[in-house]
Amino acid sequence: MTNPGPSRHLFADVLARVHAVCSALVEEGALPAGLDLSRIVVEPPREASHGDMATNAAMVLAKGAKSKPRDLAEKVAAKLRADGLIDKAEIAGPGFINLTLKPQVWSDALRTVLREGDGYGRSAIGAGEKVNVEYVSANPTGPMHVGHCRGAVFGDALASLLSFAGYGVTREYYINDAGAQVDVLARSAYLRYREALGQDIGEIPEGLYPGDYLKPVGQALAAEHGDSLLKAPEAEWLPVARAKAIAMMMEMIKGDLAALNIQHEVFFSERSLIEGGSDRVAATIDFLRAKGDVYEGRLPPPKGAPVEDYEDREQTLFRATAYGDDIDRPLKKSDGGYTYFASDIAYHKTKFDRGFLNMVDVWGADHGGYIKRVQAAIKAVTSGKATLDVKIVQLVKLLRNGEPVKMSKRSGDFVTLREVVDEVGSDAVRFMMLFRKNDAVLDFDLAKVIEQSKDNPVFYVQYGHARGFSIFRNAREAFPDLPEDASKRAAFLAAAAVERLTDPAELGLLRRLALYPRTVEAAALAHEPHRIAFYLYDLASEFHALWTKGRDMPHLRFIINNDAVITRARLALVQGVVSVLASGLAVLGVHAPNEMR
């Protein structure tokens, strides 16, 4: 078998070679034709001592081949040993194959990093497919709070990750501006309007929004309308106050998001579904009714619910059970208005109508029970052509030195996103919000995230990038021609004798760099940007460990004054590390500093 050298995605390259071996065994009659190779994986082994990669090829093909897994593994391993990239192929356990690659693979992998620069790790698996990522979508009733922050960062990082993996991404915000909560907002703003005109409003009544952030809305209403709204009936002043309050709240929210470097391309108004001369909610219900998915009927009482909480009446129902939900769902309320669910169906149908077959929604922890009904609705309105993946982000517990943080006076009852960003910076917020899987509760300690220690992941990763540039600055005594520009520096170092990098710690870093493209693809396919954060921490940790090792063992230092060859090779390794750190941090929306201040 020829050896074309490692591809950008070394794991994909080896997987292709495993597939080629299986195809060769089919041609030889050792395997039957028609076997499904899609379940074969090539991945890092659980233990580093087991080699560089492992494959389950024999395990997943054995049944179809009517063979014992270990017997089939012997045939696959024998052919893999003849491959130019593979040094050893060993059978383990019930039939896994552990692979050790030849040393030059890792030096070639580093050259790939140097050659591709900030393009290294970028994938084409998305093939330009359109993906709609809807995130934040907070009610326009006040400033962003720390709970919104996690979903905002997660959604933004996921959108960047999918774009990096080759998808055509649209970032969308759904403005919930048609529910009862915006009427409460309007009444709260009207109270502040009266206050702006000099009236004593006393204590804010229970049920209205108490935060000081509504004072500017009241002042703006007073400046625009004088006292004319005081004499107007509620039917006249309510829509005026509502429109002004929503507009000013959305500007505030956009400003809060900008503090985290988050921007959306589309802001879609819920109210637009029923205004502007067409009722798209009614049209969607009619569309589903024509398909037989909407009917008039009665729901059985909820199990365990008190009788007084159940209203036995004829309702307009979506036949959600036909699409995997537990019960059919009401589309209209007792007063004749649409349920929120009905609006949600119509909204998601607009995504489909705009050409999105792949949708991702980022929701808060309190929406977990809503997933099945919306996924059922999307199956119905798209005839199964579109898919929705809902990512739930769990709660954030805001702490300072382990103690809960007190609420904000400005907001009334929560800590604002802006307060947190102003205190610790957007980098710390973004990285730490991603340094835990989205469906796990996150403890965010304001004191810990600004510590300069290895116990603070964002510092440790950014310090890895800064340490690399510190090494470059020190190296200019030996290499005064070492370029400042990253691409020119990579080209300068591309001719280094990187095969001289043979210490286990150096080889470990090379393997870690080679893992980056696979990590990107796996994270994108799973919609899990935290995998990038975890990877960056591991890469930075190995880099710091090698630096520390060189401090204790002079022959392993990055700069050896009397050995220009090994110094240049290690500078090439440093270039690879800082390049991948910068790439991964960019995906997460975090800066990669050249020095720590």
From Swiss-Prot:
Alphabetic keyword roster: Aminoacyl-tRNA synthetase, ATP-binding, Cytoplasm, Ligase, Nucleotide-binding, Protein biosynthesis
Superkingdom of origin: Bacteria
Record-level GO cellular component terms: cytoplasm
EC annotation from Swiss-Prot or TrEMBL: 6.1.1.19
Main location: cytoplasm
Localisation per UniProt entry: Cytoplasm
Motif range ('HIGH' region): 138-148
SUPFAM superfamilies: Anticodon-binding domain of a subclass of class I aminoacyl-tRNA synthetases, Arginyl-tRNA synthetase (ArgRS), N-terminal 'additional' domain, Nucleotidylyl transferase
GO MF entries: arginine-tRNA ligase activity; ATP binding
CDD domains in the record: ArgRS_core (cd00671)
The reaction(s) this protein catalyses: tRNA(Arg) + L-arginine + ATP = L-arginyl-tRNA(Arg) + AMP + diphosphate
Pfam families (UniProt xref): Arg_tRNA_synt_N (PF03485), DALR_1 (PF05746), tRNA-synt_1d (PF00750)
Gene Ontology BP annotations: arginyl-tRNA aminoacylation
HAMAP family: Arg_tRNA_synth
Family (UniProt): Belongs to the class-I aminoacyl-tRNA synthetase family.
Subunit-structure text: Monomer.
Name of this chain's protein: Arginine--tRNA ligase
Species in which this protein is naturally found: Nitrobacter hamburgensis (strain DSM 10229 / NCIMB 13809 / X14)
